[in-house]
A protein has these predicted regions:
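Short, glycine/acidic-enriched capping/hinge loops at junctions between secondary-structure elements
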Residues: 3-4, 8, 76-80, 206
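Histidine- and aromatic-enriched segments that form or immediately flank copper-ligand environments
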Residues: 59-186
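C-terminal segment of N-terminal export signals and the immediately downstream linker at the start
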Residues: 34-72
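N-terminal export leaders
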Residues: 16-35
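Acidic-aromatic/histidine active-site loop/patch
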Residues: 192-208
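RNA pseudouridine synthases
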Residues: 188-190
């Protein structure tokens, strides 16, 4: 028996089915459109990007340039600034093969804040791990950091910012390392699925 329990006082109303579907349709969408209620200074500071839909790009070169910046995102019908990589949310999928050596040039285009990328679960030298204050100083505004490392393992991982609440604001992506030897089985198609949540609030304010 299914019983519907009415929300208590002060409860946040659930979005309508229509709004939920609109949010799903916008998955991975970064929109450069103005919205009522968004401060004009925020709109001016954010990068005006075209509407992007579908899965993020897959980057598999061993030399890759990544630009961390601010774009406008709309998942719920409201627009707010997000932290993106190459204008994409989620960030591009990075896909390599075990045994390769990769060079990533990560440029910080944020005007006021440092940033970083941590390669979650990857075996790395300390100065390539990407944790500010622990393994390096972070990437200041206008700076570029050169990550250089050998891939000594295979598996499915992810990468994300370790600076402030940038991960919660959109700076995360999938990292796939295929084994050195081809898989002993066939498959028709492969899908990379990332689960995350989203808030229209400033993540820093949400965690206070």
């Amino acid at each position: 028996m299914n019983t519907r329990i009415p929300p208590g006082p002060g409860a946040v109303p659930m979005p309508s089915r229509r709004l939920f579907v609109q949010g799903l349709a916008a998955g991975g969408v970064v929109a450069g459109i103005a919205a009522v209620g968004v401060p004009q200074r925020a709109l001016a500071a954010a990068t005006a990007a075209p509407r992007l839909a579908g899965a993020p790009a897959v980057l598999s070169d061993t030399r890759i340039e990544l630009a961390i910046g601010e774009s406008l995102a709309n998942f719920t019908g409201r627009t707010r600034p997000a932290i993106t990589v190459n204008g994409s949310l989620p960030a591009p999928i990075l896909r390599w093969r075990e045994g390769q050596t990769v060079d990533l040039f990560v440029r910080n285009t944020l005007e006021r804040h440092p940033t970083s990328i941590h390669w979650h679960g990857i075996l790395l030298p300390a100065n390539m791990d990407g944790v500010p204050g622990l393994s390096f100083n972070g990437i200041g505004p206008g700076e570029t950091y050169h990550y250089h490392f050998e891939l000594k393992q295979s598996g499915t991982y992810w990468y994300h910012s370790h600076s402030m609440f940038q991960e919660q604001a959109g700076l995360y992506g999938a990292l796939i390392i295929d084994p050195a030897e081809p898989a002993p089985y066939r498959h028709d198609r492969e899908h990379v699925i990332m689960l995350s949540d989203w808030t229209d609030m400033d993540p820093g304010a949400l965690f206070r």
